[in-house]
């Protein structure tokens, strides 16, 4: 089987982290974000994976090529000279995706969930249509494009309603698909949208179905969702693979701590915390709902809450970081500084309080 991951471009929503590293290589729960997807595809029997990229592919090649042998897959980079949207990349990779008659998976690189690829393939085969969209239920459907089903045929899509003012359903597109190769014939070689241009054609043919996603789902392409998705992922691990979570007397609940990290015995960690390799956490530190990427130092008695701390950053003594603050690579926060919701660009030093949302350049 084959799969295409829509990697895309600059990752602007996840800045300042993506100023230093392409978004797919930003670590989510201590592994590059895209590796979660490559592993799930490989486990479902996918042997050919296409990465559709238009930004810094050379940076990703060396990192991702080493996963080919590990997971027994062929990884091909399909490089766009201009951004082609969400459908154009399928046309660009037509030669690979149409090399046989088997269907192929498509997924957005920002999506983290309990990937149901095996079940999705079986369901797609059973209904005989040309495409299947994975759908997830949301509490506030008025914020999204909602899927409306045909009343006479289970799971057959009748139409899409963008941000409905009245309730028409609560299922939305989860950014995971399986499509037959002939769907590529509906796509032109230009920037185009699979959601607004390709899928409506399949709906008109009565050939597009939904598969309901069980478990959590999150688009982690921006900081607040990255943190929320981390919490959901850890919650899922606690239910399905509790052995993968870190344990200890100073861990409140649901944390992943790299074995190389050094944590003071009287620091308190959790819930919903990820600490990367070679981090050093001092005495009296409290970390809640936060992610620390590799080589970070947090000195004594600081509080880190709802924050992403970028690689090689240092937090001084008696600091308080909160409010979805994001520190880029190699940021230094001096002692006794309060940071609330700031986005701090790489290599900056902060010695004064930042009491409200700001971009520190």
Curated annotation (Swiss-Prot):
Annotated GO biological process: GDP-mannose biosynthetic process
Gene Ontology annotations for the cellular component aspect, listed alphabetically: cytoplasm
PROSITE patterns with a match to the protein in the record: HEXAPEP_TRANSFERASES
CDD domains reported for this sequence: M1P_guanylylT_B_like_N
Keywords tagged on the record: Cell cycle, Cytoplasm, GTP-binding, Nucleotide-binding, Nucleotidyltransferase, Transferase
Pfam families: GMPPB_C (PF25087), NTP_transferase (PF00483)
Pathway linked to the protein: Nucleotide-sugar biosynthesis; GDP-alpha-D-mannose biosynthesis; GDP-alpha-D-mannose from alpha-D-mannose 1-phosphate (GTP route): step 1/1
InterPro entries: GMPPB_C (IPR056729), GMPPB_N (IPR045233), Mannose-1P_guanyltransferase (IPR050486), NTP_transferase_dom (IPR005835), Nucleotide-diphossugar_trans (IPR029044)
Keyword Disulfide bond: no
Reactions it catalyzes: alpha-D-mannose 1-phosphate + GTP + H(+) = GDP-alpha-D-mannose + diphosphate
EC number: 2.7.7.13
Leading EC class: transferase
PANTHER family (alphabetical): SUGAR-1-PHOSPHATE GUANYL TRANSFERASE
Protein family (similarity comment): Belongs to the transferase hexapeptide repeat family.
Protein name as annotated: Mannose-1-phosphate guanyltransferase 2
Source species of the chain: Candida glabrata (strain ATCC 2001 / BCRC 20586 / JCM 3761 / NBRC 0622 / NRRL Y-65 / CBS 138) (Yeast)
